């Protein structure tokens, strides 16, 4: 009988996707099937003031990654992915290098549903989507 793979959730804005995201997803895929919880365009606009790439574009890129089983849009009106985690109830919620136990509001949801939390998946913080966009603005590349 084939052993069922663990369901591993990762989350983020992925706007734009960068090498740190690639490494996090690759590391998560070694643990099981990856479900990417991708923040919504309205969430990005509330957090950063803009959406560099649409959810549809980010989703298409993320679905192309090896090991990604699905990409779902976060129900993130409250600023978290708690509602989405409660719905999918993965085995593991894997967090990248910019998330820590003291800045992750999803901890209580994970405890409630017995979702294991992992930190530093894919290594430490390597790059910032916001910094990439700021650098592009500095060299004169404009969005839209």
List PLM regions with ranges.
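Nucleotidyltransferase catalytic core that binds NTPs
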Residues: 1-144
